[in-house]
Amino acid sequence: MDGYYSLSPISVLHRIKDSFHFAVSALLANLFSALFTFFFALVGTLLGALTGALIGQETESGFIRGAAVGAISGAVFSIEVFESSLLLWQSDESGIGCLLYLIDVIASLLSGRLVRERIGPAMLSAVQSQMGAVESQFQDHTDIFDTAISKGLTGDSLNRIPKVRITDTSPEIVSCSVCLQDFQVGETVRSLPHCHHMFHLPCIDKWLRRHASCPLCRRHL
């Protein structure tokens, strides 16, 4: 039987067994990957929707829009984190580095920290878009009636609004509702009368030149 090679029944069975094991392993790997992706996306969506709704309720974006932006951003970010974990797992021969990273990511995800960090820029864009739309409508209204009367504050009125310097003894360190950035110790912010909502000077001054009201609660100044 020169030039002819025949496989024994045992060799054929071994090859079939190996192929079966490979197929099952690939199927299980894809199944676990899909389950983990779904888990990350679900947690990110829920936390994102909750965080976005809370931020939206405190800003002009609104509860519904905030929840929608938060849910989408949270889901996308969570999936990106999971995919990064897979790449790290493939690049790390021992897998220990990826395991530690994954544990930290899951803990941060469940606590909501990662999602909140991602929601901030997304909600900032939504708030700025909303404020831009309001300013555009106001400008269109002014053009239609051809009036030069501004509904915003004058420079003198704006300068009379009190400024507050953030210190270590401040009762509560909050964030600016326009840019969503936390106030830092030593910063000077503007505190609106009546409602006492505080904003960064560049953030609120631009708004007040157009509107004589608080952008958060709409209380007239």
UniProtKB/Swiss-Prot annotation:
Name the GO terms of the biological process aspect: defense response
Q: Which GO terms describe its cellular component?
A: membrane
The record lists the membrane-crossing segments as 35-55, 69-89, 95-115
The answer to whether keyword Transit peptide applies is no
Q: Which InterPro entries match?
A: Gly-zipper_YMGG, Znf_RING, Znf_RING/FYVE/PHD
Which molecular-function annotation in GO is an example for this chain?
Answer: zinc ion binding
Pfam families with a match to the protein in the record: Gly-zipper_YMGG (PF13441), zf-RING_2 (PF13639)
Name where it's found. Answer: Membrane
Alphabetically list the UniProt keywords. Answer: Membrane, Metal-binding, Plant defense, Transmembrane, Transmembrane helix, Zinc, Zinc-finger
Q: Does the keyword DNA damage apply?
A: no
UniProt cross-references to PROSITE patterns, sorted A to Z: ZF_RING_2 (PS50089)
Tell me which residue ranges form RING-type zinc fingers.
Answer: 176-218
Could you tell me the membrane topology recorded for this protein?
Multi-pass membrane protein
**Physiological role:** May be involved in the early steps of the plant defense signaling pathway.
The name this protein goes by in its record: NEP1-interacting protein-like 1
Which gene is transcribed and translated to give this protein?
ATL27
